[in-house]
Swiss-Prot record:
Native source species: Pyrococcus horikoshii (strain ATCC 700860 / DSM 12428 / JCM 9974 / NBRC 100139 / OT-3)
Name of the molecule in the record: Signal recognition particle 19 kDa protein
Glycoprotein keyword on record: no
Gene3D superfamilies for this protein: Signal recognition particle, SRP19-like subunit
Family in the record: Belongs to the SRP19 family.
Amino acid sequence: MGRFVVWPCELDSRLSRKYGRIIPKNLAIEKPSLDEIIEVAETLNLKIVEVDREKLNPRLSGIDEELRTYGRIIIESPYGKVKTLRLIAQKIREFRRRR
């Protein structure tokens, strides 16, 4: 199992890759919240090691306040980081459609 940090900005469609988005823009989500990511991680049976709501990704320090997303989650996953982020993004889209 791999352990890695998931920042909301890695899933945010409003940001460029320069500011930390990892997954492709067509799979990314607008304004992903930390709570959504936690809910989806639990649904996917990923082990959440730590949640820190005050942290800011260092790449976002020079960007407008409205684009900043605070928080990070440390997750253990049997998949790689990119595959896990894609699964999380896909599930968040499904959850948002239901609401």
